[in-house]
Curated annotation (Swiss-Prot):
Pfam families: KdpC. The chain crosses the membrane at residues 11-31. NCBIfam families: kdpC, PRK00315.1. The system is composed of three essential subunits: KdpA, KdpB and KdpC. Part of the high-affinity ATP-driven potassium transport (or Kdp) system, which catalyzes the hydrolysis of ATP coupled with the electrogenic transport of potassium into the cytoplasm. This subunit acts as a catalytic chaperone that increases the ATP-binding affinity of the ATP-hydrolyzing subunit KdpB by the formation of a transient KdpB/KdpC/ATP ternary complex. This is Potassium-transporting ATPase KdpC subunit. It is found in: Cell inner membrane. GO terms for cellular component: plasma membrane. It comes from Pseudomonas putida (strain ATCC 47054 / DSM 6125 / CFBP 8728 / NCIMB 11950 / KT2440). GO terms for molecular function: ATP binding; P-type potassium transmembrane transporter activity. The gene is kdpC. Keywords: ATP-binding, Cell inner membrane, Cell membrane, Ion transport, Membrane, Nucleotide-binding, Potassium, Potassium transport, Transmembrane, Transmembrane helix, Transport. HAMAP family: KdpC (MF_00276). The keyword Oxidoreductase does not apply.
Amino acid sequence: MTAYLRPALSLALLMTLVTGALYPLAVTGIAQVAFPNQANGSLVRDAQGQVRGSALIAQDFQGDGWFHSRPSAGAYATVASGASNLSPSNPALAERVKGDAATLYQAQQGPVPQALLTTSGSGLDPHLPPEALAYQIPRVAAARQLPVERLQALLEQATLHPLIGPPVVNVLALNQALEKLAIVR
């Protein structure tokens, strides 16, 4: 029996060492050398070097002077990320969407873009379609006393055109550009 047990335990120990320590350390080392920004969470820093967030995770921007992200089912917390799992026929979902639509419609004119009313699958999508952000321009322009045309140009500069899929804008990057614009002013 020892003849069978010893090789099995040796292999289990070896594979534990390789797959549990050596391989993860090797991949981490390669990632740190080849892709240091992505390996460390795609952190976004301000001019003073302070971390402002991650380019991969949405944030809850408050106040009329900022572009707002789409709603989050998990309160923008990475631990609670995920969809609300409420069906389209669920009254709680209908009430939340109606409340959000009423709030947004009071501040603007015209129909509210769907992206401002619906959560993403992860609840943390940092991107919005340009139309959803263009809808917010009058509110942000009024709060910051900036010309609408300047914010439209800023939005155009921040719009990403991926190879596959529609154009998107990273809301954190757009708000950082907005912050820099206020400093320059």
